């Protein structure tokens, strides 16, 4: 009689533990899947942001194609390693867009700067020039374009950070994904703590990059005022980077929570089984 009661009690305890363990596994697995989806979306957004040229956009009135000044500006913009003032003047005048790697302007399609008197948008084409590595790491001057005005260290390091930090962020996320894949293969959530930490660092890098870019643009416009009737705004590439940062933070929180709580619950369940 007593043996039957003990056996029934043991059976109930085992069944209860199995049910609780299954519920916990489902909860942690759900958090892990959601974190993976957020991580994937933020990676796509970050990669698209890095690879596109719409971090900042200028809107300017139509320029006269026959102007010798406009022709000269285009030729200087198209030159290798044009100075900062030269290419920014072109961006201001020709509806320019700027990315991390390239700068683009909208110019007449005819290379000889001749168009019919009735100009339409069909005669416009976008021309882009890539920033060379020398330009990416070149010093910025207190007076843009004037090499004798002294080096502006703040703008110099803001530019370098806005260029480097997105790549660091993307690299951290890829490394975190590799660790997460290993965790899946090992059927253990605990290694995902490292994945969560890497995503947290990636989010900080993305946030730092966005902050550096905003500060750099504001300082540039203090040095080079926009011409009359020209306006500027942050583009969709910049917005993708802004959205990517909170996604990285949310993924990080879910990864760390799932790994930490799963280990804690597993320890409690192990102690319960022993008891």
Language-model regions, residue ranges each:
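Juxtamembrane/interfacial segments around transmembrane helices
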Residues: 82-96, 220-224, 247-257
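A surface-exposed beta-alpha-beta supersecondary segment
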Residues: 56-160
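Extracellular structured ligand-interaction cores
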Residues: 35, 97, 101, 162, ...
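Long, compositionally biased interface segments
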Residues: 224, 232-266, 272-275
